[in-house]
Amino acid sequence: MEKIKIIVASDSIGETAELVARAGISQFNPKQCKNELLRYPYIESFEDVDEVIQVAKDTNAIIVYTLIKPEMKQYMSEKVAEFQLKSVDIMGPLMDLLSASVEEKPYNEPGIVHRLDDAYFKKIDAIEFAVKYDDGKDPKGLPKADIVLLGISRTSKTPLSQYLAHKSYKVMNVPIVPEVTPPDGLYDIDPKKCIALKISEEKLNRIRKERLKQLGLGDTARYATDQEELNYFEEIVSEIGCPVIDVSQKAIEETANDIIHYIEQNKSK
C-alpha cells in the first residue's frame, strides 16, 4: 500500500499541527496507514503557500495546517478549494468560535504560545538545578534549594527531583548512607524544606534482589546492610527533625504531590 503523505504547514514551528496529525494517524492500524510527514514551518509568504500547494498536488498529500495570519489562512483556503485538495485547518474554526464567544478579535500572532516568559525560565532553571545538585554532588546547593530530599538508595530521589523540577521547584537530593557523612550544611538549613524518603526493609530487599538478578548474581544473593542503612537513616532524620514520607507503596507522582502539599502549607506559616 502506498504511503499516505501528510503536509504539516504552519507560520510557526508547526508543533500543534504535527501533534494533531500524529494523534489522528495513531487511531489506525500502522500496516494499513503507512504515512510520511512533510514539514513546512515558518510560512511567511504567498510563495511559501504556493510551494505547499504544489507538493500536495504532485503527491496527493493531505494538508494539515495552522496558519494564524488572516491573509495567509485565506490564501491557503482559496488555493485548497481551487485545486480541490484534501486539507484540515486546525486553528481556524476554533479561533472563529472563540472570537464570536468573547466578542473580540484574536491577536493573530504566530507562535505566541511558545513565547518565553518568566515561568518558562523558572522551570528551566529548576531542571538545571536538579541535574547539577543530584545525588548530593555539591553541598553549596543546600541553601539555594527549595526542597532537599533525603533518603537511602532506591527511594526514587532522582526521578522525584526531576518531577518536582518540572513543577519549577529547585530540588537537591542527598543520599543517606552509613559510609558517607552527610554534608555539614544539611544541619544549617531550615528543616521545613527537607523531606526524608523512607522505604520498608522488605521493599528495599526485594528491589535490591531484583537488581542483583539483573546483574546475573542470582536471586539468592542479598544485601546484608539493609537494616544498618535504615537505622542510620532514622538516626540522621531524627537529628535534622524533618518530616518523613514512606514511599514503599507510592508512585512518584503521589509522593511528589505529598511533598508539594507539605512545602506549600509551610510557606504560609
Curated annotation (Swiss-Prot):
The keyword Transferase applies. GO terms for molecular function: ADP binding; ATP binding; phosphotransferase activity, phosphate group as acceptor; protein serine/threonine kinase activity. It catalyses: N(tele)-phospho-L-histidyl/L-threonyl-[pyruvate, phosphate dikinase] + ADP = N(tele)-phospho-L-histidyl/O-phospho-L-threonyl-[pyruvate, phosphate dikinase] + AMP + H(+); N(tele)-phospho-L-histidyl/O-phospho-L-threonyl-[pyruvate, phosphate dikinase] + phosphate + H(+) = N(tele)-phospho-L-histidyl/L-threonyl-[pyruvate, phosphate dikinase] + diphosphate. Keywords: Kinase, Nucleotide-binding, Serine/threonine-protein kinase, Transferase. Its EC number is 2.7.11.32, 2.7.4.27. It holds the Pfam family Kinase-PPPase. The keyword Iron does not apply. Transmembrane segments: none annotated. ADP binds at G151, I152, S153, R154, T155, S156, K157, T158. Belongs to the pyruvate, phosphate/water dikinase regulatory protein family. PDRP subfamily. Bifunctional serine/threonine kinase and phosphorylase involved in the regulation of the pyruvate, phosphate dikinase (PPDK) by catalyzing its phosphorylation/dephosphorylation. HAMAP family: PDRP. This is Putative pyruvate, phosphate dikinase regulatory protein. It comes from Staphylococcus aureus.
